[in-house]
Structures are given as structure tokens and as C-alpha cells.
């Protein structure tokens, strides 16, 4: 089997990069990145990646960065990591300055020649982990993808590097989860004589939504699911609204449910259960179970015929179709006077229940069922 590698940056990734001079040149400046020990130790013990440290240390060995100020902190860092089971198969340090344009300086690949075009290594299955766009560019240059330790990828978009970023996060918990269990993404295309629907989602996203169904109020409700569950959600619908709203709403629920079910995968490590949310004058309760047995209990009444362009009779139908397609048990109850608040509260409660139930723990990566199947 070919070897996979994690090419790991040092400053800003393993340790906090010192502000002002960006030099880790004293023991007082040594501060480890939050959660790095538990998660990198987990990756080292559970997965088959080689660990290679790849770092630029500007002017190391010159008067601006004497070696005697570098090695004590560096060696203590390595010793501390090793004490937690984190060792490196190779450590590559470039000492040049940016203006030198050295072939060995990241994002150039001169230090990595032993891994490039080497049949023993699976670079497509490898990752660069780092906090700078140059780390993502290095991933591009050696033919792998990057885990970018930043929240925003705006800088990557400016440089045309966003497609080489597999994950953007500042949380080592997410890094370990991604490498161990993968991202829970899915895409469903549902086409009938009445509708053409695309649903794409990432259960481990940031709540980014791009929704267009042709029904403004329905869009607003679906946005609550993405925003308040934390999933990235794209829904594009072309439906026969010239007939009525029924097919658009029903088929969207089916496609969304199928997409959630597909993205869930094995369900290992998930919480499985979730519940609840009050809103203004309303109390809306949603309890759910991803146990594989669809069922809907609905206790909510609406006096108006429509809210926005959405018939209130379709609310129950939406959640029944969603429950069936996602193979989840839903129990929904809403009390209150304001009809808009009531249904919006239900959608928000569903979202928060989803967030709770979909939470995944790789350190307890078991199926949440005594039967051994969900």
C-alpha cells in the first residue's frame, strides 16, 4: 500500500506564531496550538499517515536569527510532542529569506523531492496542514490538498487557491474528525415531470445557505435549517408553480431528506437524538431520532390559509415527506398565537435538534444503538 503523508507546518500550526518578529527564539515564546496534543496524537495512533514537518525559518543561522536561539525552543517542542506520542518521520527546515527565492522555500518544492513522483507515496491522499496561503500553494504544487488553519478562505480565493483547500478551520478537533471520518457531504438531483431539484449539503459546515425554490417564505424557512443547524445547504428548485405549490414543497422535502440520510453515512459517533426551541409568543418543540424508522407526530394548528406564498396545509406534508426520506422519527408540537412565529419556530427547532443529533464524536466512534444497526 502506498504511503500517505501529512506535511505539517510548524509556526501557527503546531505552536502559536510569536507576534511582531514571528521568531520562536526563546523558551518563553513557546506556546502550543490549542488542542494539538490530543488530536495529533489521535491521528498518529489511529491513522497511517507519515508525519513530515515542513517549515520556513527566515534567516536561521544568521545574525538576525542565531541558531543558539532557535534550537532550545524547537527541541523542547519536539520533546513535548514526543511525550504525547507525536513524532515526525522527517523534519525539513528552509533557512532562506523570502527575497532569496530559494527552490527549497515553501511554497516551492525543493525540500520535498523525495516524495514527488515517488511510486511509494500517495500524494493525492496526502495533505498539507498550515495556516498560510503558501501552505495551500505547496499542496497545489505537490499534487495534494490542504487543511488550512484559518476560518476564512477569502485570501485563497484572491489567489485562486480555494479548490486546493479540503478544509478550513482553526480547530484541531475538526482536523482530526475530517482525517479520521471524512466530511459528511451529499448531493441529490431529483427530476420529475413536475420539478427539477438540486440539494447539496455539508453536515459539518458553517451554516452557509444558497436557497431558491420560487417561494420566498419557503426559502426563508429552509434557510433556518441551514443557519441554525450549522450545515452548509444549497437548494435549487424549478417547480410547476403555475399549477400550485404542492409539488415544489413536497419534492424539496423528499430531496432534502434523502440528502441528509446519504450524508449521515454509517451514523457512527453521532448523538442520534435532538430536541427543542421556544420563540417569542410561541413554544415550539421538535424531538427527533435518526433511528432508521420514519414516523411523524404532528401537533400544530394554523388558522391562516397561507403564510407568504406557502399554504399552511403543506407544513405537515413537508415534515412527513422529510421524515420519510431521511428515515427519522419526528415529534413536533407548537403553541402560540402568531402564525408566522409558530412555523418559523418549528423550522428553527428542527434545525437545533438536527445540530444536536448530528454532532459526531470520533473519540467514541460507535453506533448509538444496542441492536448494532440503525
UniProtKB/Swiss-Prot annotation:
Q: Which residues bind Mg(2+)?
A: 9, 11, 131
Where in or outside the cell?
Answer: Cytoplasm
Q: Where is the active site?
A: 9 (nucleophile), 11 (proton donor)
Q: State the UniProt keywords alphabetically.
A: Amino-acid biosynthesis, Cytoplasm, Histidine biosynthesis, Hydrolase, Lyase, Magnesium, Metal-binding, Multifunctional enzyme
Question: Which intervals of the chain are annotated as region Imidazoleglycerol-phosphate dehydratase?
Answer: 184-374
Q: Which InterPro entries match?
A: HAD-like_sf, HAD-SF_hydro_IIIA, HAD_sf, His_synth_bifunc_HisB, HisB_N, Histidinol-phos, IGPD_sf, ImidazoleglycerolP_deHydtase
Is Repressor among this UniProt entry's keywords? Answer: no
For this protein, what reaction is catalysed? D-erythro-1-(imidazol-4-yl)glycerol 3-phosphate = 3-(imidazol-4-yl)-2-oxopropyl phosphate + H2O; L-histidinol phosphate + H2O = L-histidinol + phosphate
**Cytoplasm listed as a keyword:** yes
- Identify which cofactors the protein needs according to its UniProt entry: Mg(2+)
Instruction: Please list the GO biological process terms of this entry.
Output: L-histidine biosynthetic process
GO MF annotation: an example:
imidazoleglycerol-phosphate dehydratase activity
Sorted alphabetically, the Gene Ontology cellular component annotations on this record are: cytoplasm
Region described as Histidinol-phosphatase: 1-183
The pathway this protein participates in, as annotated, is: Amino-acid biosynthesis; L-histidine biosynthesis; L-histidine from 5-phospho-alpha-D-ribose 1-diphosphate: step 6/9; Amino-acid biosynthesis; L-histidine biosynthesis; L-histidine from 5-phospho-alpha-D-ribose 1-diphosphate: step 8/9
Task: Tell me its EC number(s), please.
Answer: 3.1.3.15, 4.2.1.19
Q: Name the family the entry cites.
A: In the N-terminal section; belongs to the histidinol-phosphatase family. In the C-terminal section; belongs to the imidazoleglycerol-phosphate dehydratase family.
Protein name listed in UniProt: Histidine biosynthesis bifunctional protein HisB
Gene source species:
Bacteroides fragilis (strain ATCC 25285 / DSM 2151 / CCUG 4856 / JCM 11019 / LMG 10263 / NCTC 9343 / Onslow / VPI 2553 / EN-2)
